[in-house]
Amino acid sequence: MNLIAKLEQEEIERALAGKTIPDFAPGDTVIVNVNVVEGNRKRVQAYEGVVIAIRNRGLNSNFIVRKISSGEGVERTFQTYSPLLASIVVKRRGDVRRAKLYYLRERSGKSARIKEKLVSKDRAAAASQE
């Protein structure tokens, strides 16, 4: 492993200290809690939407979450290892056949729905034991 890769790995471990990032994939509905600083106040803001893209680039990894707010589509890009991310919660697993769901930008209503990925009972039991 070269020097830059080692430094990036150390920074990733430092960023993950005390928090866990769940496994999520494009199509999943997630709730991203973000630390927001307004003046001297600090609060946590929740952003819920569908993950439409994940970009794995080591320390520079990010993901895009899309939601519909007041009838308008809003997309927000989050840095995976950012200290501003308080937590990520996977609310619902989506069953999609693409890695990038940019086609959802042109769709609205029923055509923008994503099927839910149903896991079998024995797989769910095995996952809960780990």
Curated annotation (Swiss-Prot):
> In its UniProt record, which GO terms are filed under biological process?
translation
Fetch the Pfam families from UniProt. Ribosomal_L19
Q: Which keywords does this Swiss-Prot/TrEMBL entry list?
A: Ribonucleoprotein, Ribosomal protein
Highest rank taxon of the organism: Bacteria
Any keyword NADP?
no
Listed GO molecular functions? structural constituent of ribosome
Cellular component GO terms held in the UniProt record = cytosolic large ribosomal subunit
Q: List the disulfide bonds.
A: none
InterPro entries (alphabetical): Ribosomal_bL19, Ribosomal_bL19_CS, Ribosomal_bL19_sf, Translation_prot_SH3-like_sf
Q: List the PANTHER family.
A: LARGE RIBOSOMAL SUBUNIT PROTEIN BL19M, RIBOSOMAL PROTEIN L19
Which HAMAP family does the record match to this protein? Answer: Ribosomal_bL19
| Protein purpose | This protein is located at the 30S-50S ribosomal subunit interface and may play a role in the structure and function of the aminoacyl-tRNA binding site.
Q: Which family does it belong to?
A: Belongs to the bacterial ribosomal protein bL19 family.
State the NCBIfam families in the record: rplS_bact (TIGR01024)
Query: This chain belongs to which protein, by name?
Result: Large ribosomal subunit protein bL19
